[in-house]
Regions:
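Short beta-strand-centered segment that lines the nucleotide-binding/catalytic pocket of NTP-utilizing
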Residues: 78-92
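Conserved lysine of the Walker
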Residues: 64
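Short phosphate-coordinating micro-motif centered on Lys-Gly-acidic
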Residues: 2-27, 109-173
């Protein structure tokens, strides 16, 4: 999908209450430059509601942190302030129009180590919460979250897949 057509598609997928029609829906797009990544970041920032948790998936070097930079920049955070939280595990960016919380689960040993960071406070923190390598702590994610899968297709080119995930509640035994 081209960037100009992306806004309404992402708006329909990522905003509001989850419904069953979203279960198999995937919005995909390709970007071919850092400028297009920044444009995509503006679109995504404009459609995500505060309180949204975003799972970022992709190989090393796929552009997960660069994408968070693009979204944070669209929210008014200076791009140079956004760095990978690989060694500190979480970065908080509060200088923009809304808080952005940026986790990196790559080095976490298990779910308990993630839970020690107090993610619920961030999930309910009135901003956006991005989690790189979220597949490593998937059971700790909220019931409803956005998933963005990034694949590197060239030096500055990336393929993005957007999904809305809502896990069913299990009935008590």
């Amino acid at each position: 999908m081209d960037l100009p057509d992306l806004h309404p598609a992402l708006n329909a997928l990522l905003m509001g209450r989850w419904n069953e029609e979203m279960r198999e829906k995937c919005v995909e797009c390709d970007v071919h430059s850092l400028e297009e990544t920044d444009s995509l970041g503006k679109i995504v920032e404009s459609v995500l509601e505060n309180g949204t948790v975003i799972s970022l998936l992709g190989t090393l070097g796929a552009g997960k942190t660069r994408f968070v930079q693009a979204v944070a920049s669209a929210a008014g955070v200076p791009e140079e302030d956004v760095t990978s939280p690989t060694f500190v595990l979480i970065q908080e960016y509060t200088s923009g129009s809304r808080p952005i919380f940026h986790f990196d689960a790559y080095r976490l040993k298990d779910d308990d180590e993630f839970l020690e960071l107090g993610p619920e406070e961030y999930f309910d923190g009135g901003g956006l919460t991005f989690i790189e390598w979220a597949d490593r702590i998937e059971t700790c994610l909220p019931r409803d979250y956005a998933e963005i899968r990034i694949s590197q297709t060239g030096p500055e080119s990336r393929h993005f897949e957007f999904r809305r995930i809502c896990r069913r509640r299990t009935k008590p035994a």
